[in-house]
Amino acid sequence: MKDLVNRSKRMSRRRLAPIRAGESIDYKNVGLLRRFISEQGKILSRRVNRLTAKQQRNMTKAIKRARILALLPFLNNEN
């Protein structure tokens, strides 16, 4: 009985979507891109940021483009 209660609590908890309906994945949207980069400047994995495979591919391309255009740093070595 206790397992059923615990299982139902876990199943009912829903996580919010990391990207809202109005937001688009674009290299110029630096505020959005920063949410998907670690403190060291690495791109977070799909498991961590809960994106779909297609969204993760687009996010990675946008982050790399923004880095090349110097909108985002390649590394964050601020101590």
Curated annotation (Swiss-Prot):
The protein's name: Small ribosomal subunit protein bS18c
Subcellular location: Plastid, Chloroplast
Entry-linked NCBIfam families: S18
Name of the encoding gene: rps18
InterPro entries noted in UniProt: Ribosomal_bS18, Ribosomal_bS18_CS, Ribosomal_bS18_sf
UniProt cross-references to PANTHER family, sorted A to Z: 30S RIBOSOMAL PROTEIN S18 (PTHR13479), SMALL RIBOSOMAL SUBUNIT PROTEIN BS18M (PTHR13479:SF40)
GO molecular function (one): structural constituent of ribosome
GO cellular component: chloroplast; mitochondrial small ribosomal subunit
GO biological process: translation
Pfam families per the UniProt record, alphabetical: Ribosomal_S18 (PF01084)
Summary of subunit composition and partner proteins: Part of the 30S ribosomal subunit.
Family according to the record: Belongs to the bacterial ribosomal protein bS18 family.
Domain of life: Eukaryota
